[in-house]
């Protein structure tokens, strides 16, 4: 039977393929899947970035980032952008929202560096601040981080030793040390820099296309490259005149109190800590990094102002 079937069965030769007319086949008409969810704006999914640095942040400069604030906004809207190395980058889809959160500690510290009348010391300080180099990194880790205290391994995890530490001062940055009135110049420029961030966020805000949130990073230093940083995000463009940094307030409790005191009408904000994996147990400790202990009012203040924690960024999962 098998031999008979092989002998008398149909054959399909390669030459017959060209004779086939697929247009004669009956194919179903593709139908787009239609799903209409019930209106619920609180459950819509949006994609964005709440931790973004530009060339205005010194650590970004160290990594060779030469992209400015306006370029960052255009990139968030989906425009292509060329990196310092010539690579063309573009998002697969534009973002729905973005907050540029450059380090507030750097506001005003490099604004004057384009002045041709700077002294030799001022020019040297500006070179250190603008050119990625190991020397300035060492200066910052020693000077701007304040006075360190030795760790106490006998203490339970998450409980920092209550030893007084000296918080760094506004004049710690090299560019704010040299020249007559250098510190006052940096403080004035810091206010002007912050005003520029507010202006550009408003400029690139496009309802229904891109929501630009005004923000910055609060970045106190810790020993051994520890991180205890927070991004400060404002709800509207009604924001304080100054961006409070770790040069103004020494810890998170004082940050929240300071922001509440300087926020005017229609001003609202939240903070988000990041890198809790490098905070040496302090992110959820009952002590601040400089030894201040949380009271009941402090916990309620944190509950009101810090409902979120960042869990992923360019450094990886935390």
Question: What do the PLM-derived regions correspond to, one by one?
Answer:
Residues 4-318:
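Extended, charged catalytic domains and RNA/DNA-binding interfaces, predominantly
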């Amino acid at each position: 039977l098998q031999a008979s079937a092989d002998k008398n069965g149909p054959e399909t030769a390669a030459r017959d393929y060209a004779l086939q007319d697929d247009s004669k086949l009956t194919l179903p008409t593709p139908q787009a899947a239609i799903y209409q969810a019930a209106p619920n704006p609180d459950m819509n999914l949006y994609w964005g970035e709440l931790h973004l640095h530009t060339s205005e942040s010194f650590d970004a400069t160290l990594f060779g980032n030469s992209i400015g604030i306006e370029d960052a906004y255009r990139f968030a809207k989906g425009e292509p952008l060329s990196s310092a190395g010539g690579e063309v980058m573009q998002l697969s889809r534009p973002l729905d929202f973005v907050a540029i959160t450059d380090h507030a500690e750097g506001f005003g510290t490099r604004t004057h560096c384009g002045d041709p009348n700077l002294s030799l010391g001022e020019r040297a300080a500006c070179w250190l601040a603008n050119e990625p180099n190991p020397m300035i990194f060492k200066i910052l880790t020693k000077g701007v981080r304040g006075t360190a205290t030795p760790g106490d391994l006998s203490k339970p995890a998450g409980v920092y030793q209550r030893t007084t530490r000296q918080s760094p001062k506004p004049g710690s940055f090299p560019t704010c040390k040299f020249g007559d009135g250098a510190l006052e110049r940096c403080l004035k420029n810091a206010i002007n820099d912050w005003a520029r961030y507010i202006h550009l966020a408003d400029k690139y805000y496009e309802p229904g296309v891109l929501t630009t949130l005004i923000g910055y990073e609060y970045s106190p230093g810790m020993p051994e490259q520890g991180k205890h940083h927070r991004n400060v995000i404002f709800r509207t463009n009604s924001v304080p005149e100054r961006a409070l940094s770790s040069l103004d307030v020494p810890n998170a409790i004082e940050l929240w109190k300071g922001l509440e005191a300087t926020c005017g009408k229609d001003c609202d904000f939240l903070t988000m800590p990041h890198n809790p994996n490098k905070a040496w147990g302090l992110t959820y400790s009952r002590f601040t990094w400089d030894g201040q202990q949380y009271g009941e009012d402090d916990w309620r203040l944190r509950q009101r102002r810090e409902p979120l924690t960042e869990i992923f960024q360019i450094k990886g999962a935390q």
